[in-house]
Regions:
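Basic/aromatic DNA-contact patch characteristic of tyrosine site-specific recombinases
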Residues: 1-42, 48-55, 59
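N-terminal core-binding DNA-recognition domain of tyrosine recombinases/integrases
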Residues: 30-45, 54-146, 176
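Short amphipathic alpha-helical face segments that pack within enzyme cores
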Residues: 49, 112-116, 188-191
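Short glycine-rich, low-complexity/disordered patches
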Residues: 50, 101, 196-197
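Flexible interdomain linker/hinge and immediately adjacent N-terminus
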Residues: 127-171
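Short flexible/disordered coil segments
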Residues: 132-140, 188-197
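Basic, Lys/Arg- and aromatic-enriched nucleic-acid-binding interface segment
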Residues: 167-196
């Protein structure tokens, strides 16, 4: 792997970076984006997840001998194919070298982090806007009668989301859980959840 992520502490803040192992230097665009996320007071878990994801994309670009500017300047169909290829790269586990398939939701979240980087670089004036991203408006009337509208960015090429596999707890399951409870508060909370469904 050519690109890796890491972190350093400066006082009470933790800063994340993406490093090129061939040159030993920081990957400036990714590191600048991660610093921006820290300065926006995003949670450390969020920034850590993004820092964990970006090297996979940078390695993907490196293997294809592309730069982010090359991708941003592609035509719509080429960009669509590029990001679909990245989704498959992650989905099939090629990004880690284990070739173990990951869930669609995981692959989609990795691509969302990449789009966040492209959006940040566009706002900084370093890259043009991606052709595959679509700005959409959403509006509704609030309960007090005012019109509320917002704009969001959409991408139509995400993989289908995985359905959550859940099962209903039986009476025996609940009794088993209640018998394992150490205190009355937990018993009460579980009983209330059972009553309310």
């Amino acid at each position: 792997m050519r690109y890796i992520s890491g972190h350093v502490k400066k006082g009470r803040k933790t800063y994340y970076y993406v490093k090129d192992t061939q040159t030993g230097s920081f990957e400036k665009s990714c590191t600048k984006y991660l610093k921006h996320k820290i300065l926006q007071n995003r949670s450390l878990n969020t920034v850590n997840r993004i820092a964990y994801t970006l090297p996979y994309y940078m390695n993907f670009l490196s293997e294809r001998e592309l730069t982010m500017m090359d991708v941003a300047n592609m035509k719509f169909t080429d960009q669509s194919e590029h990001f679909y290829d990245f989704l498959m790269y992650v989905k099939n586990g090629i990004h880690t070298g284990t070739y173990r398939e990951v869930k669609n939701n995981t692959a989609n979240s990795y691509l969302q982090a990449v789009f966040g980087l492209y959006n940040f670089l566009h706002r900084c004036g370093e890259l043009p806007y991606l052709n595959v991203l679509d700005d959409r408006n959403f509006s509704y009337v609030s309960p007090v009668g005012t019109n509320v509208s917002s704009t969001y960015t959409a991408y139509d090429g995400y993989l289908r989301s995985n359905e959550h596999q859940s099962r209903v707890a039986t009476k025996e399951d609940i009794e088993l859980i209640l018998s394992a409870c150490q205190n009355n508060r937990d018993r009460l909370l579980i009983s209330l959840m059972e009553e309310t469904g």
